[in-house]
Structure formats: C-alpha cells, structure tokens
C-alpha cells in the first residue's frame, strides 16, 4: 500500500470574511469602531467604579473584573481580525495561534465564572439581605475572583495543550476570525477523538456548571421577588438583576450555539457571524447593558461628567 504524502503545517492562513472584497473596508471600520467602543466603555466602567465610593460594593467589584476581562478578551481577538481584513488574509505561526487560542479560552472561561459569581452575589443580596455583608466579605470577594482566574487558567492550559498535540497537515487555511478549536480540528491529519472529547467536556461541564449556578440563583430570586407585596418593591428588586440576565443570555446563548452542536464540515458564514457576536459585540455591549438599567451607575456617570465640565466664570 502506497504511503500518502502530507505537508506538515507549521503556520496557518486566516481568511475570514476575505471572500467579500466589497465589504473589506466597511467591515474593518465597523470592527475597529466596535473595538474602540469596547475599550472606552469598559475602561470607563472600571474608572467609574474605582472613583465613586457609592460603587465600592461587591456587585460592582465583580463588574469591574468583568470589564477588565472583556478588555483582555477583545484584545486577544480583534487586532488579529483587523489584520486579516486589512491584509486580505494573514499568516500566523502555530505558536502565535496557540497563544491566541489560550488567551481566548482563558478569558472566556473567566467570563463564565464571573457571570456565575455575580448571579450568586445577587441571590445573596436579595434572598439573604441580613447576612449579605457577612457572606460576601472582602476576603470572600477576592477568593471568588481568584478562583475564577485560576480555574480559567487551568481550563485554557488543558485545552491548549490538548489541541496543539495534534498534527496539522495539508491545507493550512482557517476560514474563521481567530484560532479556535473547531476549525483547527478540521485541519488535523491524525485521530482527533481526544480533542473532540475535550470540546464536549468543556461544553457539558464548564458552561452548564456556570449556567446551573445562575439558574438556581435566579430561581430563588424570582421566588423572593414574588413574595414582595408592593409592585414598586418587586420592580426595584428585579431591576437590579435585569442587566445581569441580559448579559448572561447574550454571552451563553452564542457560546452554546457554537459548542453544543455538530462541528463537522467547513465553517459556515453563520459560525463566523455568531463568533463575532461573542468576541466583538458582547464585550462592547456589557458596559451599556449595566449602565442603562442601573440607577447607581447612571448617577455616578452624571456626577463624573459634571466634575469634568469647566467651572463657569462669574
């Protein structure tokens, strides 16, 4: 039996959206504006939380870390995407591809854990208000956030090592916006069963574990809200959770679509659109989501803007 000759791949060629030549410049400008809005919005949120003493609470402590992670999350993906559009496709070494995949997985995992932690924080505030300050102490806050970073690192390390023990050969074109595991598996020339199991484990344990914490927390919150007699009290309590629920639905909805389904075949246009939602749009919208429905954030923003205005001369 004749042996098949394979060309070993040591670098990849990212080509997402480059087939639409007429959209290259508009897409570049759109993604660049989204990235700048993400950086401005999330940096502004962090500075606002640190600068206003009224926002020095556990909820905003977790939100500031979510904003920090969103900045890093976007920065790991969007600059490379802009290079792909500007250069009409770009070459990336296997080492850089592995680094990008690690950073994406690291920050995406932390996002999952932080959203679950924020749901638990809301549950404690609504359902156990008298014990809130004794449960969510400063030590507990730092412990939860540190745990999210450590768990995110472990998840990213395992997935990256597992993915890049594969042999890649033949076609080196990745028709996707960044180095993600599903498109990489399509380029492997060996048995990728172990790597596919890792995808399933991540999809069936990490995300659902976070979602379970969120669902259980909000189940208790809904029960507590229904027991409030005044309509105004119910509305006020629910409004403190509505922003978080919106962010959860947007983030987990797109991730579930990407990972809890069949990944065979070539990356479709729909895959790339969904990947743009969770890597570009969601980090940009988070500061807006938490600002529009949050009275404390709006008041802090107005206060900061009033301070920045030059004083009028008499």
Swiss-Prot record:
PROSITE patterns reported in the protein's UniProt record = G_PROTEIN_RECEP_F1_1 (PS00237), G_PROTEIN_RECEP_F1_2 (PS50262)
Topological domains, Cytoplasmic? 47-54, 121-139, 218-237, 293-314
Could you give a single Gene Ontology term from the biological process aspect? Answer: sensory perception of smell
* Keyword Metal-binding attached: no
Spell out the InterPro entries in the cross-references: GPCR_Rhodpsn, GPCR_Rhodpsn_7TM, Olfact_rcpt
| UniProt KW keywords | Cell membrane, Disulfide bond, G-protein coupled receptor, Glycoprotein, Membrane, Olfaction, Receptor, Sensory transduction, Transducer, Transmembrane, Transmembrane helix
The way this protein sits in the membrane is described as: Multi-pass membrane protein
Glycosylated sites: 5
Q: Does the keyword Repeat apply?
A: no
Q: List the disulfide bonds.
A: 97-189
Output the Gene Ontology terms for molecular function. Answer: G protein-coupled receptor activity; odorant binding; olfactory receptor activity
Where does it sit, as one GO cellular component term?
plasma membrane
Hey, which stretches end up on the Extracellular side? 1-25, 76-99, 161-197, 259-271
Query: CDD domains, alphabetically?
Result: 7tmA_OR5-like
Q: Where is it located?
A: Cell membrane
What SUPFAM superfamilies does UniProt report for this protein, alphabetically?
Family A G protein-coupled receptor-like (SSF81321)
Transmembrane ranges?
26-46, 55-75, 100-120, 140-160, 198-217, 238-258, 272-292
Please tell me where this protein is predominantly located. Answer: membrane
Function text: Odorant receptor.
* PANTHER family in alphabetical order: OLFACTORY RECEPTOR
Give the family, as the similarity comment puts it.
Answer: Belongs to the G-protein coupled receptor 1 family.
Q: What is this protein called?
A: Olfactory receptor 9Q2
> Gene encoding this chain?
OR9Q2
């Amino acid at each position: 039996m004749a042996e098949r000759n394979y060309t070993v791949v040591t670098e990849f060629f990212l080509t997402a959206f480059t087939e639409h030549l007429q959209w290259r410049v508009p897409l570049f400008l759109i993604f660049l504006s989204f990235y700048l809005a993400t950086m401005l919005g999330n940096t502004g949120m962090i500075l606002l939380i640190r600068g206003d003493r009224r926002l020095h609470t556990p909820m905003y402590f977790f939100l500031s870390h979510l904003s920090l992670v969103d900045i890093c999350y976007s920065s790991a993906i969007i600059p490379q995407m802009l290079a792909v559009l500007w250069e009409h496709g770009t070459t990336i070494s296997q080492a850089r591809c592995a680094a990008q995949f690690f950073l994406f997985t690291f920050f995406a995992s932390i996002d999952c854990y932080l959203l679950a932690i924020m749901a638990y924080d809301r549950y404690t505030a609504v359902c156990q208000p008298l014990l809130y300050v004794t449960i969510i102490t400063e030590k507990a806050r730092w412990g939860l956030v540190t745990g999210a970073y450590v768990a995110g690192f472990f998840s990213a390390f395992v997935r990256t090592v597992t993915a890049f023990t594969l042999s890649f050969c033949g076609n080196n074109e990745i028709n996707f916006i960044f180095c993600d595991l599903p498109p990489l598996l399509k380029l492997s020339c060996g048995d990728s069963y172990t790597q596919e199991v890792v995808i399933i484990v991540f999809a069936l344990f990490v995300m659902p574990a976070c979602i379970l914490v969120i669902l259980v927390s909000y189940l208790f919150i809904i029960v507590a809200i229904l027991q409030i007699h005044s309509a105004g009290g119910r509305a006020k309590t629910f409004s403190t959770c509505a922003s978080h629920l919106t962010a959860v639905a947007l983030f987990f909805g797109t991730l579930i679509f990407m990972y809890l389904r069949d990944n065979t075949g070539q990356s479709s246009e729909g895959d790339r659109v969904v990947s743009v939602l969770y890597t570009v749009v969601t980090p940009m919208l988070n500061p807006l989501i938490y600002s529009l429905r949050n009275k404390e954030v709006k008041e802090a923003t107005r206060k900061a803007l009033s301070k920045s205005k030059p004083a009028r001369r008499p």
